[in-house]
Regions:
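Conserved N-terminal catalytic core of the sugar/cofactor nucleotidyltransferase
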Residues: 1-7, 15-21, 29-123, 127, ...
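Left-handed beta-helix
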Residues: 1-4, 197, 204-276
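Active-site glycine-centered loops adjacent to acidic/histidine catalytic or metal-binding residues
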Residues: 11, 125, 242
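A structural signal for short hydrophobic beta-strand segments in well-ordered beta-sheet cores
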Residues: 27, 163-166, 230
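Glycine-rich beta-alpha junction loops
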Residues: 59, 89, 153-154, 179, ...
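Residues that scaffold the ATP/ADP-binding catalytic core of kinase and kinase-like folds
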Residues: 66, 175, 201-202, 249
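Conserved core of the sugar-phosphate nucleotidyltransferase
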Residues: 129-197, 204-206
Length: 276
């Protein structure tokens, strides 16, 4: 298998207020007929990635029922699979996922059994349409160990994001989380392609109990001058992890698609969902 997609879909979503009171963030309805998770799943399916795992944790029932066998996204085929990965009890330790990378680390045996060449790590609460094949193409051309999707943002808003500084070849020189005086406008989208051996190396050697990609894994790889690059994405993307951003994303749909940059009904890149 070439690519295994792992979608982080266990966030409690307290900043979404009552919307996520009885369901996990990615299971929250969006634009009437969709769920937020539909975007990451449809992007995988449209990109030809049919081996997908969802890492769930908080109130997973609604999400599990929505996903089912994965048929709307073509994950029920003989050469496809979709797996729900819940945290499990470990000897002498907390079973809950403690950080983004810890969630992946707790499923390290799953990755080893799948034995993919690359692991694509996604967030389950973003609204966007992206062909991951272009990102993978750049990853291979750069002979990268890790490629991170970034979006250029207005420099006056850059202090709200994790920001990367890169050289002329887009190799990452520095990363700073929410800098007071940003030196770049390349904001992290929380989308990563790892070479599997590099991912496993860092999951196994970093001992932080709350292991996180932004706080621990990425800074360590940059500090050790590993081959870490960015892939620039400049189309519509919205992290809907807060009530305000969720409302903004829904209001964006009132505008003309050419103004906003996203069309939910474009037949060339469909967003699939479960038919109730």
């Amino acid at each position: 298998m070439k690519v295994l997609a792992m979608i982080l879909a266990g966030g409690r979503g307290s900043r979404l207020d009552i919307l996520s009171e009885k369901r996990v963030k990615p299971s929250v309805p969006f634009a009437g007929k969709f769920r937020i998770i539909d975007f990451a799943l449809s992007n995988c399916s449209n990109s030809g990635i049919y081996d997908v795992a969802l890492l769930t944790q908080y109130l997973p029932l609604s999400l599990n029922e929505h996903i089912g066998s994965g048929k709307p996204w073509d994950f029920d085929r003989r050469d496809s699979s979709i797996t729900m990965l819940q945290p499990h009890e470990k000897l002498g330790g907390n079973s809950w996922y403690q950080g983004t990378a810890d969630a992946i680390r707790q499923n390290i045996d799953f990755i080893k059994n799948k034995n993919p060449k690359y692991v694509l790590i996604l967030s389950g609460d973003h609204i966007y349409k992206m062909d991951y094949r272009w990102m993978l193409k750049e990853h291979e051309e750069n002979d990268a160990e890790l490629t991170i999707a970034v979006q250029p943002v207005p420099i006056e808003e850059a202090s709200r994001f994790g920001i990367f500084e890169v050289d002329k070849d887009k190799k990452i020189l520095n990363f700073e989380e929410k800098p007071a005086e940003p030196k770049s406008n390349l904001a992290s989208m929380g989308i990563y392609i790892f070479n599997t051996d590099s991912l496993l190396e860092y999951l196994e050697k970093l001992e932080n109990s709350d292991l996180d990609f932004g706080k621990h894994v990425i800074p360590s790889m940059i500090q050790e001058d590993r081959k870490v690059y960015v892939h620039t994405y400049d189309s519509y993307w919205k992290d809907v992890g807060t009530y305000d951003s969720y409302l903004e994303a829904n209001l964006d749909l009132i505008k003309k698609s050419e103004e906003v940059g996203i069309n939910l009904y474009d037949q060339g890149w469909k967003i699939y969902t479960r038919s109730e």
